[in-house]
């Protein structure tokens, strides 16, 4: 029988009490040492999990060394956020096993997933099925994933895809504006998606300020993902201040 894994249970239990904040680290952009420091800092500030991955598909020792450094520096769950089937590390706690539902290319809907499935099973990583939706502008992930980005002013399209994802068995829905996007996902879109689905809703991309994080949470996001704003802070101390600011917007 299928059983929900430890990390997914952790997410659901925490969501009964508060909204969650996940920090995304891209192994292409951060060294293992920096990743470890950010993870340690994140745990002290009250972040709930660390996601590791990126659009350009860091893999192998580059990925493994970052995951190991995070595991050695904090007790937060480490969840893989792979750009392809190569983005799997045996050292992670879980993987967002996601389908890019609005891709034009079936490889990103089911093909890459099929290629990675046995690796996930062999490593014993907890898979968490997730519907992944790219919202305009989409940035690098939209280009790499050959997505047809959902227009920002068409929340009903996002809601239809999100509900389809839930009905297909996905246990999370992620609305993604793209790392470093000039604007985050519109609150109106978040609100409509939240209204029609019953599974947790993740929102990421373009969230740089406490106010933007708060607006997303107030609109209905259950989990906020930040990354670029922290990675590009310029120093560890600046990263700490940015993390504290963003976290205060989520934990309202």
Curated annotation (Swiss-Prot):
Q: Which catalysed reactions does the entry list for this protein?
A: sn-glycerol 1-phosphate + (2E,6E,10E)-geranylgeranyl diphosphate = sn-3-O-(geranylgeranyl)glycerol 1-phosphate + diphosphate
UniProt cross-references to SUPFAM superfamilies, sorted A to Z: FMN-linked oxidoreductases
Q: What is its EC number?
A: 2.5.1.41
Q: Which GO terms describe its cellular component?
A: cytoplasm
Q: Which prosthetic group or cofactor does it need?
A: Mg(2+)
Binding residues for Mg(2+), per the UniProt record?
26, 55
Q: What is this protein called?
A: Geranylgeranylglyceryl phosphate synthase
Q: Which NCBIfam families match?
A: GGGP, GGGP-family, PRK04169.1-2
Q: What are its GO biological-process terms?
A: glycerophospholipid biosynthetic process
Originating species: Thermococcus gammatolerans (strain DSM 15229 / JCM 11827 / EJ3)
The root-end lineage is: Archaea, Methanobacteriati, Methanobacteriota, Thermococci, Thermococcales
Q: What class of enzyme is it?
A: transferase
Q: What does this protein do?
A: Prenyltransferase that catalyzes the transfer of the geranylgeranyl moiety of geranylgeranyl diphosphate (GGPP) to the C3 hydroxyl of sn-glycerol-1-phosphate (G1P). This reaction is the first ether-bond-formation step in the biosynthesis of archaeal membrane lipids.
Q: In which pathway does it act?
A: Membrane lipid metabolism; glycerophospholipid metabolism
Which superkingdom?
A: Archaea
Instruction: List the Gene Ontology MF annotations in alphabetical order.
Output: imidazoleglycerol-phosphate synthase activity; magnesium ion binding; phosphoglycerol geranylgeranyltransferase activity
Q: Which UniProt keywords apply?
A: Cytoplasm, Lipid biosynthesis, Lipid metabolism, Magnesium, Metal-binding, Phospholipid biosynthesis, Phospholipid metabolism, Transferase
Locate the residues binding sn-glycerol 1-phosphate: 174-180, 205-206, 227-228
């Amino acid at each position: 029988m299928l059983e929900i894994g430890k990390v997914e249970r952790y997410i659901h239990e925490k969501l009964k009490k508060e909204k969650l904040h996940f920090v995304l680290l891209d192994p292409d952009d951060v060294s293992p040492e920096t990743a470890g420091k950010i993870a340690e800092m994140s745990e002290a500030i009250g972040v709930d999990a660390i996601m590791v991955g990126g659009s350009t598909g860091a893999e192998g020792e580059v990925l493994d060394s970052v995951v190991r450094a995070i595991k050695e520096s904090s007790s937060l769950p480490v969840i893989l956020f792979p750009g392809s089937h190569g983005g799997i590390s045996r050292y992670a706690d879980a993987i967002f096993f996601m389908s890019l539902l609005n891709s034009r290319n079936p490889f990103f809907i089911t093909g890459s997933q099929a290629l990675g499935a046995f690796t996930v099973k062999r490593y014993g990583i907890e898979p968490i099925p997730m519907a992944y939706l790219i919202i305009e502008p989409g940035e690098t992930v939209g280009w790499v994933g050959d997505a047809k980005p959902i227009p920002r002013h068409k929340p009903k399209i996002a809601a239809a895809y999100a509900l389809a994802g839930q009905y297909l068995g996905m246990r999370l829905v992620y609305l993604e504006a793209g790392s470093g996007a000039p604007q985050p996902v519109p609150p109106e879109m978040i609100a409509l998606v939240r209204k029609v689905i019953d599974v947790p809703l993740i929102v990421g991309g373009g969230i740089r300020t406490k106010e933007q994080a708060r607006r997303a949470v107030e609109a209905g996001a259950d989990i906020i993902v930040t990354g670029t704003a922290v990675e590009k802070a310029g120093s560890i101390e600046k990263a700490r201040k940015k993390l504290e600011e963003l976290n205060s917007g989520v934990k309202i």
